[in-house]
Amino acid sequence: MPMRRLCLILLCGLVAVPAALAGARVTGDGVLELSKGDGLVVVNGTRGTLWGQMDKGKLVVTDPILGDGQVFVSGADRTHIVSDSVTVYAGVDITFRVTGGKYKLRLQGSGIDFTAVGVGTAQLGGDVLADHPGVYALDSGTWNPVPAFPATRLVSFGVQPTATQ
């Protein structure tokens, strides 16, 4: 009986180690968080959800594939519809949420906070005149300072599945 138990434990170990190593490379959703951002942020989401708020500034929403997701914005003082897929919002205390589908958000202002869950990229550029242009974190990791413009940082969150043929 003890020999069977030992064999079973060793067999489980042989199966678990490769599975754990493969788990680090699987495709899936990532998380990008921005806190107290001042400057310019451009988020290109391939899929997923994003929600946040901006104390003051301008938000340009691009929905490249109409109907594949929904974009909700509230609190804007001014709204300008540029085309079927592009809308510009400006003002104070703007809140926004994107659910599903592809999206592009261009946020320029102060007090930008958001969380993006899914797959995408973000270009982060802090306001050079700001005392503290904000911090960001990937996958609940350590918080990193947003670089001040003209320096920017391109960050990716999540892993897009590769196309199979």
PLM features: what roles do these ranges have?
Residues 1-6:
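Positively charged n-region of N-terminal signal peptides that target proteins for export
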Residues 8-9, 157:
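General helical structural elements
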Residues 26-31:
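N-terminal "mature head" segments of proteins
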